[in-house]
Amino acid sequence: VTGMAIAQNNTNSPYTRYGYGDLSDQSFGNSKAMGGIAFGLRDGAQINPLNPASYTAIDSLTFIFEGGVSLQNMNISGSGVKLNAKNSSFDYLAMQFRLHPRIAMSIGLLPFSNVGYSVSDTQAATDPTTGNTADYARSYTGDGGLHQLYAGVGVKVLKNLSVGVNASYFWGDINRTRVLYFPSVSGAYNYNHQSVASVSSYKLDFGAQYTFDINKKHSVTIGAIYSPKLKLGNDYSVTTQMVSNSTGTAVSTTTLKPDATFEVPNTFGAGFTYNYDKRLTVGLDYSLQQWSKTKFDVNTSDEAVREDFNETYTYCNRHKVS
């Protein structure tokens, strides 16, 4: 018998059991409305933090304050069980303004990832000594996520060329719990396993844009971005407990705080937009996140802790075309 429960969080996905969870789409409203393109997008009335070079499009009389929330409706099915999950989440909050005829700035708060799941199932186990069969249940829950507070500057170095950089403080906590228990066996001991990863660091993101003015009505903007690989400062702990099913008290508790390594990858991106008379904009973006070259490691002699860590933090490269 298998069951599934969904936690109320910023996301409702069992896939967030792995890695940093569901990686957030950090594009803003204008970019989302165009399928997620951002690297070549340049609009003086919109904030585009995915390419800080775009900040210079704002004029001296404009101050932009923008926020976003999202609503999610998800249908999940598995092992004959169908569930519907609804949730809402904060997406972003940012402002943008001109500092100088050639310099503009943006400040904002973005989510980087979200973790939220609660999955359980029930299995049958046979005692090899007595031959008796008893049901046991497994429960997997998780919550948390990573966040990014940025301040960015764009500089118009030439008439048609702008460059920019975002400096960000990066932080968050991810909690994951795994429980194995025997609901119908009074003398059994239940097993609880909880891992907590708290990370923080600073990161830089770079961007550039060049605009070709074909004539008064037609223009093309080419953009590129780069984010270097980053090692995150962290505190990682694992707590395991054996809990008496009859009394509900822990008979043993072990807490480990091994040295762990967490990273975010090199990110490369390029794109372009074509604009006609400020009435029509079309574009294309490509990005690559080199997750396969990031390092996730835990230094411990406890094989169970090491296997759980390696299973949780395994990534492949992420390609995106918008």
Per-segment meaning from a language model:
Residues G3-A7:
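Sec/Tat signal peptide C-region and signal peptidase I cleavage site
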Residues Q8-A33, G80, R98-S322:
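Outer-membrane beta-barrel porins/channels
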Residues S13-A38, T56-N75:
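Transmembrane beta-strand segments of Gram-negative outer membrane beta-barrel proteins
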Residues G40-R42, Q148-L149:
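Short hydrophobic "helix-edge" motifs at membrane interfaces and signal-peptide entry regions
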Residues L41-T122:
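Outer-membrane beta-barrel translocator/receptor signature
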